[in-house]
Amino acid sequence: MTAVAPRVDGHVAPQRPEPTGHARKGSKAWLMMTTTDHKQLGIMYIIMSFSFFFLGGLMALLIRAELFTPGLQFLSNEQFNQLFTMHGTVMLLLYGTPIVWGFANYVLPLQIGAPDVAFPRLNAFGFWITTVGGVAMLAGFLTPGGAADFGWTMYSPLSDSIHSPGIGSDMWIIGVGATGIGSVASAINMLTTILCLRAPGMTMFRMPVFTWNIFVTSVLALLIFPLLLAAALGVLYDRKLGGHIYDPANGGSILWQHLFWFFGHPEVYVLALPFFGIISEIIPVFSRKPMFGYIGLVFATLSIGALSMAVWAHHMFVTGAVLLPFFSFMTFLISVPTGVKFFNWVGTMWKGHITWETPMIWAVGFMSTFLFGGLTGIMLASPPLDFHLSDSYFLIAHFHYTLFGTVVFASCAGVYFWFPKMTGRMMDERLGKIHFWLTFVGFHGTFMVQHWLGNMGMPRRYADYLDSDGFTTLNQISTIFSFLLGLSVIPFVWNVFKSWRYGELVTVDDPWGYGNSLEWATSCPPPRHNFTSLPRIRSERPAFELHYPHMIERMRREAHVGEHDLRAETTQSPTPAEVR
């Protein structure tokens, strides 16, 4: 890897891009608060998300410390309840979801050749309302009764005013609604940008895989976040006005579970699909090959999006109120398109010239971790096994293998991959690999043993256990490795700060040398409206064709460009140079 990629066409490497137009005046803080630039907002989303991630991780360390040994009890039961409630909320709604929009904001307009997103002010509104919602939820810790303590799933009757009377619970519900509004705003923006602002020649089946994944994610977000907002307002109505919507006497507890999980399981794919897209961008670059099975990968993404709306009730097997065969079958079925994605990723790496830069290491770490989480998910799709393992630490381990394995590993891969594009500087490879191995070892040491804890019968959300239960040794192993996992953020944060200021300067469009999509056809960082000129888009690899024009004919001979692109080539109007 070099920050100055080799060129074969006599091209002179450009210097850092000069600012275009007049610089805006005012303090940096004011400019940040009033910006509508999608690139700045994307970076702000990513910084905000990782800030909440660090807070959520601190809560997790307190939870693990409490469980180190029986009878420790340095936290009260009430404090423990508040911590696991806020930990789950922060990680899902304040880290996992906003960082999706962070990468989408920065990368997606570049990948489709757009000068900005469709609605810049709506974009800024989505960011700030999400941030305010997150602060409101966390401010519950400062109220007399403390933060929300009914679990991040907000099950009734735990969430009613009798069992959770504090104002912190009300602030949590309002914060959830605010983050939902922010996600809807971002989803509208991304959909409109993709449908209306693609560059000439950028057909739907020439879009990068990451853009396709954001497209499907945005559709899912528009379907589920309004439901979450309406359902959460119903809880607030019950608490403040005595609505009895979720009163257990009226079947309200089961109603809430249906409403919540109809949001909750597609939300898992809102968190997963964009990061599948990030991995699909990274693997071809460091395998030195085009994506194997591009069309199949796109249709696998569409299939996952469709099937994700039909599996919510597998979270409710133990209620006895759902049709077990249907939801079990649909859960097994959704693993098929996910398996197709793995087949395509492995096929892309197969016989490629793989180089192990930091983004590629994180991508392979994602694949191994998520694969294990997916296999345990197949186990839980079987109702008899689910009856035994439900609400145990086996479920906690599965959930973290799928979501931590997806969101954290792939978001770190994305940061290392696109950091040169965002800042014009390279990150430190040695620190990046230290960060990876601390995270990989710490994560697997923390959560692997929790499968056995769950199978032995340890329930989730318990603040203590008996020495005679036999859980002590495995809990101590899990806690020790959790602190190793916590330490992994230190080299990451230092790497970001150091590289932002002192990293190796990038003077070419594509510092990795083999980028495929359009973001690698503009400077690092890009100018205000992204491009000073656009290359001709003749396939799903326009940047690669720009940098390696002598490879175009060979790629067509080897069928690395689909038939739809060849047909489009024959029907395109000739350029002025071709006419002359």
From Swiss-Prot:
Family named by the database record: Belongs to the heme-copper respiratory oxidase family.
Protein function: Cytochrome c oxidase is the component of the respiratory chain that catalyzes the reduction of oxygen to water. Subunits 1-3 form the functional core of the enzyme complex. CO I is the catalytic subunit of the enzyme. Electrons originating in cytochrome c are transferred via the copper A center of subunit 2 and heme A of subunit 1 to the bimetallic center formed by heme A3 and copper B.
SUPFAM superfamilies referenced in this protein's UniProt entry, alphabetically: Cytochrome c oxidase subunit I-like
Pfam families: COX1
Binding sites annotated in the UniProt record for Cu cation: 265, 269, 314-315
Subcellular locations according to the entry: Cell membrane
Residues noted as binding Fe(II)-heme a in the record, renumbered to the chain: 87, 400
Protein name, UniProt field: Cytochrome c oxidase subunit 1
Organism: Corynebacterium efficiens (strain DSM 44549 / YS-314 / AJ 12310 / JCM 11189 / NBRC 100395)
